[in-house]
Swiss-Prot record:
Signal peptide span: none
Subunit structure: Monomer.
Originating organism: Sus scrofa
Species classification: Eukaryota, Metazoa, Chordata, Craniata, Vertebrata
SUPFAM superfamilies reported for this sequence: Trypsin-like serine proteases
Protein name: Glandular kallikrein
Keywords for the protein's UniProt record, in alphabetical order: Disulfide bond, Glycoprotein, Hydrolase, Protease, Serine protease, Zymogen
Amino acid sequence: APPIQSRIIGGRECEKNSHPWQVAIYHYSSFQCGGVLVNPKWVLTAAHCKNDNYEVWLGRHNLFENENTAQFFGVTADFPHPGFNLSLLKXHTKADGKDYSHDLMLLRLQSPAKITDAVKVLELPTQEPELGSTCEASGWGSIEPGPDBFEFPDEIQCVQLTLLQNTFCABAHPBKVTESMLCAGYLPGGKDTCMGDSGGPLICNGMWQGITSWGHTPCGSANKPSIYTKLIFYLDWINDTITENP
């Protein structure tokens, strides 16, 4: 099974201010996951990024520089999708018949973010993603494929991937690939999301379509594309959760 702790290979540093909705989620003071600002007061990330003490940074590019664009928030409540199997967080083992479905979670910030050039909300998708489309994933995840050595960059990285048929992922991974997941990668290998990119966005043809969820280690292996939570499947849950928990 893939390591479920959070999950860029073959990417490059993103352009400054090209990713103002990108969130860096910390557990206490250590970087853990990416996320996306979906509302001034709400961040969407992966459910497997759940922790007991969130620190959330917006407006970041280099995590090791003092950036005047940065905004820092605590979290007043977390809402993992009720269908996600939280037992996956414990010993990273799963009961038979369980899978990595519904890997998304909302975090409510202690106060609304201030919208600036470096901090913006990303719109949810309004149409189905198109197979074969070019997608961009971004994050501060490992730039080394692992599993023995992971190396984390200072600056956020962006990588171009292709949206593939789910059968490519089903053939590549022993775990179940469901209709609420997207499959994206680069089949020759060498480009992929990796450990620490989880919870970040997958943007296809300019529209936000996925959340980085899980994949194979070493990252970027040929014919082993990664799995992303399919956002359009969850619009009602996202909107209802935000509305019901002001």
